[in-house]
Amino acid sequence: MPLPDFRLIRLLPLAALVLTACSVTTPKGPGKSPDSPQWRQHQQDVRNLNQYQTHGAFAYISDQQKVYARFFWQQTGQDRYRLLLTNPLGSTELELNAQPGNVQLVDNKGQRYTADDAEEMIGKLTGMPIPLNSLRQWILGLPGDATDYKLDDQYRLSEITYSQNGKNWKVVYGGYDTKTHPAMPANMELTDGGQRIKLKMDNWIVK
């Protein structure tokens, strides 16, 4: 099936990515050791989550395109998740449903696509090389396969450096939502050369 000329409506102002919630804490002071028991406990608490969902603002910025959207991310089980991107008017631009061995994506024209790899599909259909497979861990504040990372003074991720498939991603966490337990990321930015991905999570629901 030919790939569509798929581009999200780019109307969401970048200012919407500014954090305003008083419950967000930002890293202060020197970071902690990745070998600390507090960090191991935090990772275990996050991994123990069976279901979670979050929504907020998304921005992808490169020399070729600038995309702004609202997003909704829901995980309902191991390797089962749903990603929804909407424009500022609330219309769906992209809906992705993934489960083991099957990924389905519906674009803003109602066209349905199937594949085995969500990251590859999103890249081909949107032109945005989003590291979705790693982002599923990073958005939770977990390093995933990355071994080069730093912690903040509260034993949470503050920075990740990760190289794969010719990409050199740097992830910086700007704050955490302390209304949830465990505390979850509230603001993060991914960069690779001239590409930037910004995520601002409005809230989390975890189980």
Swiss-Prot record:
TM annotation in the entry: none
Classification via Pfam families: LolB
Any GO CC annotation of this UniProt entry: cell outer membrane
Localization of this protein: Cell outer membrane
Keywords, in A-Z order: Cell outer membrane, Chaperone, Lipoprotein, Membrane, Palmitate, Protein transport, Signal, Transport
SUPFAM superfamilies: Prokaryotic lipoproteins and lipoprotein localization factors
Domain of life where this protein originates: Bacteria
Lipidation (N-palmitoyl cysteine): 22
GO biological process: lipoprotein localization to outer membrane; protein transport
Lipidation (S-diacylglycerol cysteine): 22
Topology versus the membrane: Lipid-anchor
Signal peptide: 1-21
Oligomeric and partner information: Monomer.
Role played: Plays a critical role in the incorporation of lipoproteins in the outer membrane after they are released by the LolA protein.
Protein family membership: Belongs to the LolB family.
Protein name as annotated: Outer-membrane lipoprotein LolB
Organism listed in the record: Shigella boydii serotype 18 (strain CDC 3083-94 / BS512)
